A protein has these predicted regions:
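Short aromatic-glycine motifs in intrinsically disordered, low-complexity regions
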Residues: 6-8, 41-46, 196
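Extracellular beta-rich repeat passengers
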Residues: 173-177, 182-186, 190-277
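Extracellular beta-strand-rich solenoid/capping regions of secreted or surface-exposed proteins
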Residues: 23-30, 38-55, 61-80, 84-97, ...
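Structural detector of coil-to-beta-strand junctions
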Residues: 67, 90-92, 114, 137-139, ...
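Right-handed parallel beta-helix
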Residues: 51-57, 74-85, 97-111, 121-142, ...
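Acidic Gly/Asp/Thr-rich repetitive segments characteristic of extracellular carbohydrate-active
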Residues: 1-35
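Residue-level marker of regulatory loop/turn positions in helix-turn-helix DNA-binding domains and
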Residues: 70, 94, 118, 150, ...
Length: 277
């Protein structure tokens, strides 16, 4: 939607092995395909400009210590990277950034969000990622007072992600409608799975919840409730969840993995090293 997401497209490929090279490549004003090789140790947030594909080479490409900041830019793809030990967010999408695809990455042991999307960003897919050993996973909408920028935006799809013993925000949603959370595997989530707040509309569909006492609920902290529709979810040793209200129609066609098969499909397919890059 919104013209599709192609990243760097057919642009030439640059391989980066240092923090300086990574920062320069992702911050370029021209379209590029960037391959991250080995472990890059860095700090702070690196600005990612429009029309970039950022790919991890092999199974072990790692960005450690820093994060990627997509700030008002568009058409960015991030795939097959191990993010760890970030000191802010691993991936931050903000200021009306659009057409972003975050796919087949691992996130562990960072400070704040693994994938935080906020400030009017739109048309984003977060798919086939694994989050483990981490607290604040995926925030969608940063403030109860930001309705003016966020209402009508923050339309995000989360599918086939593996929330592996992570704590909270899978996602925590303000204002976005529809937000589509489907075919994810929640295993041993210690805080809560999905929270719909501040008049958001979230469809929680075909997910597999295991050992998760609070799979989804309305409101969170000081944030008032949103709407949440749940259908065709599969539960093993988990709570029932809280629903209410209605959600805008999903604007695209999609095929659901059979909910009882989601655990197998996602644990075999999510995270790095699964897509042959």
């Amino acid at each position: 939607h919104n013209g599709g997401t192609t990243g760097g497209g057919n642009a030439g490929t640059t391989t980066v092995t240092t923090a300086a090279a990574l920062e320069s490549a992702v911050g370029s004003s021209t379209a590029a395909v960037i391959r991250v090789s080995g472990t890059i140790n860095c700090s702070g947030m690196l600005r990612v400009r429009s029309n970039k594909t950022i790919l991890g080479a092999g199974n072990s490409a790692t960005i450690s210590g820093c994060g990627l900041n997509i700030n008002g830019d568009r058409n960015v793809i991030i795939r097959n990277i191990n993010f760890r030990n970030w000191n802010d967010d691993a991936i931050n999408v903000q200021e009306s950034a659009t057409n972003i695809w975050i796919d087949h990455n691992n996130f562990t042991n960072g400070y704040d969000g693994a994938v935080d999307i906020k400030r009017g960003s739109d048309y984003i897919t977060v798919s086939w990622n694994r989050v483990f050993g981490h607290d604040k996973s995926m925030l969608l909408g940063h403030s109860d007072s930001n309705a003016g920028q966020d209402v009508g935006h923050l339309r995000v799809t989360y599918h086939h992600n593996w929330f592996d013993g992570s704590n909270q925000r899978h996602p925590r949603v303000r204002f976005g409608n529809p937000v589509h959370v489907f075919n994810n595997y929640y295993d041993g989530v210690t805080g809560y799975g999905v929270a719909s707040t501040m008049n958001a509309g979230v469809l929680v569909e075909g997910n597999y919840f295991e050992n998760t006492d609070d799979p989804y609920h309305l409101g969170e902290g000081s944030s008032g409730p949103g709407s949440l529709v749940a259908r065709n979810n599969h539960f093993v040793n988990s709570g029932n969840g809280q629903t209410g209200g209605s959600v805008a129609a999903i604007p695209y066609g999609y095929t659901l993995t059979t909910p009882s098969q989601v655990k197998s499909v996602v644990t075999n397919g999510a995270g790095t090293g699964k897509i042959g890059l």
